[in-house]
């Protein structure tokens, strides 16, 4: 781990030496005036509503097991049945207007699990979530052996 940390620090140094001073000052004012905390509260309310709608839609369709942080976040980590290939599901769902992120890229090389995927909700309106999960369920059914 120490060697990795050293390499990461060296890379960071090449990518970003110092944020511009005016950007640092603007952010400092934004935070000092309480705007950052207010924005976090707004985001928590906004995303919390979407999260609840997504949770209800997933519960209704009972397709997959899933996990999501209880402290925020913008996506659910989904585990499909063993036969499910999340890459094929991503392609089929995209044809139906639903985007998911296959999970194998999140696993260490050689340990990829093809039935996992990430389902994000930060850019989808609450009114579209239930329909999207219905479409995702239909996409799964087309792949069922």
Model-identified regions with their sequence ranges:
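PLP-dependent class I/II
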Residues: 1-145
